[in-house]
C-alpha cells in the first residue's frame, strides 16, 4: 500500500479512536504521554542502529546523480551531486532525525503550552508508520537490497495517487565494503553521457 495512503487511513482510524478517550482524566493523559515517549524512543533507537550499520559498512562506492532544482525556483537544470553511498545514507538519516526532532518540538509546544493532549495519541502512531516505510529502514533493518524502489538516490515520497519523479542516478566504481546496502546503477554513468554528447557535437 502507498505509504501516504497508509498514513491517511491510520490517521483517520486513530482520530476516531482518540475521540472516545476522556482527556480530562489524568490517567488517560498519563498513558498518552507514555505512548508518545515510547514511540519516540523506538524511533531514535532505530536511527542509532542504522547509523551504526552505515558506519560499519563504510560503503565508499561513488554515487553521482542530478538533484532536481527546487520547486518554483525558476531553474530548469538540477544540481550535479558527487558523493558516496555512506555519505548519502548518513545525510538522509540526518534529515530524518531533524524531521523527528521538529515534530517533537511542535508536539511539546502544543501539549505543554497549549494544553492539547489528543495529538499525543496520533503522534504516537503515525511517526512509527513513517519509520517502518522509510527506505533506510528497509535497507539496514529489514536487509532489503538497494535496488528498484530502494535504489539511490531515493525517489521523493509519492502522493496519494502515486507519482513522484526520481532524479537520474549513476553509480561508478566499486567498493570492497559494499553489500546489500550498496547502490546499483540505473543506467549509463554521467561520464558516458558526456562522452556521447561530445561525440555527437564533433
UniProtKB/Swiss-Prot annotation:
Topology versus the membrane: Multi-pass membrane protein
- Specify the protein name: Uncharacterized protein C589.06c
Instruction: Tell me which residues bear Phosphoserine.
Output: 185, 201
What parts of the sequence cross the membrane?
A: 34-54, 102-122, 125-145
Specify the species.
Answer: Schizosaccharomyces pombe (strain 972 / ATCC 24843) (Fission yeast)
Q: Where in the cell is it found?
A: Endoplasmic reticulum membrane
Give the family this protein belongs to, as stated in its UniProt record.
Answer: Belongs to the PHO88 family.
Q: Which stretch is the leader sequence?
A: none
Amino acid at each position: 500500500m502507498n505509504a501516504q495512503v497508509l498514513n491517511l487511513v491510520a490517521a483517520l482510524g486513530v482520530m476516531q479512536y482518540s475521540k472516545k478517550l476522556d482527556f480530562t482524566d489524568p490517567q488517560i493523559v498519563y498513558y498518552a504521554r507514555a505512548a508518545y515517549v515510547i514511540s519516540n524512543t523506538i524511533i531514535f533507537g532505530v536511527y542509532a542502529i542504522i547509523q551504526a550499520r552505515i558506519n560499519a559498512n563504510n560503503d565508499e562506492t561513488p554515487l553521482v546523480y542530478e538533484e532536481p532544482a527546487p520547486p518554483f525556483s525558476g531553474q530548469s537544470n538540477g544540481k550535479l551531486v558527487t558523493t558516496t553511498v555512506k555519505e548519502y545514507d548518513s545525510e538522509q538519516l540526518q534529515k530524518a532525525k531533524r524531521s523527528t526532532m521538529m515534530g517533537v518540538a511542535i508536539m511539546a509546544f502544543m501539549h505543554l503550552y497549549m494544553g492539547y493532549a489528543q495529538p499525543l495519541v496520533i503522534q504516537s502512531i503515525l511517526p512509527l508508520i513513517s519509520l517502518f516505510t522509510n527506505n533506510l529502514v528497509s535497507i539496514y533493518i529489514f536487509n532489503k537490497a538497494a535496488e528498484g524502489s530502494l535504489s539511490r538516490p531515493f525517489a521523493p515520497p509519492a502522493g496519494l495517487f502515486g507519482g513522484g519523479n526520481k532524479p537520474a542516478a549513476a553509480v561508478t566504481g566499486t567498493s570492497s565494503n559494499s553489500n546489500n546496502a550498496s547502490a546499483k546503477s540505473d543506467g549509463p554513468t554521467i561520464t558516458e553521457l558526456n562522452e556521447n554528447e561530445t561525440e555527437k557535437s564533433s
